[in-house]
A protein has these predicted regions:
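Conserved short strand/loop->alpha-helix "switch" segment adjacent to the catalytic nucleotide/phosphoryl-transfer site
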Residues: 1-19, 23-34
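A short coil/beta-turn micro-motif at the C-terminal edge
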Residues: 29, 41-43, 98-102, 111, ...
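Short beta-strand patches within cytosolic ATPase/nucleotide-binding catalytic cores
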Residues: 36-38, 95-97, 106
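Glycine-rich/acidic phosphate-handling loop/turn and adjacent ATP-lid/helix
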Residues: 39-80
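Glycine-rich nucleotide-binding loop
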Residues: 50, 61, 99-106
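A short, conserved alpha-helix near the extreme C-terminus of the histidine kinase catalytic
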Residues: 79-88
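Glycine-rich ATP-binding loops of the HATPase_c
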Residues: 89-99
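C-terminal end segment of the histidine kinase catalytic
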Residues: 108-126
Length: 126
């Protein structure tokens, strides 16, 4: 995926905010924590293509109540800024699902709003 300036700024902010929270409150705080990051382009007939980023953290032991509260919805300045950027500037969405040992965050944005190549390239068959 080749991002344009707006997409680069938005996803740079997203990675910074999510990594900061992982270090302070989440899976990166303790040895054995796991972080999985994936992205895909979702294309459905009759709908605009979307870029979908998933961030999944898992800690080897349950989070304490205060950390779970922060990861589960208490919004600091960085999270509010990220939300405003993804929803307001890009017309996308952010969802987060908290579990006892981690959090899953999904960011979905219109593909044509964040890429310098709005047409989806088909992979060549080998």
């Amino acid at each position: 995926v080749e991002l344009n300036e707006t997409g680069t700024q938005a996803f740079g902010l997203a990675f910074h905010e999510l990594a900061t929270n992982a270090l302070k409150y989440g899976s990166a705080r303790s040895p054995g924590g796991v972080l999985d990051i994936a992205w895909s382009i979702r294309s459905q007939p009759g709908k605009k293509a979307e870029l979908v980023l998933t961030w999944s953290e898992r800690s080897p032991e349950p989070l304490d109540a205060q950390d779970a509260e922060v990861l589960g919805g208490k919004k600091g300045f960085g999270t509010k800024l990220l939300d405003a950027t993804i929803r307001g500037e890009l017309g996308g969405s952010i969802t987060s699902v908290k579990s006892d040992c981690g959090i899953d965050v999904t960011i979905t944005v219109p593909y044509d709003r964040v890429t310098s190549r709005p047409k989806i390239l088909k992979t060549a068959k080998r």
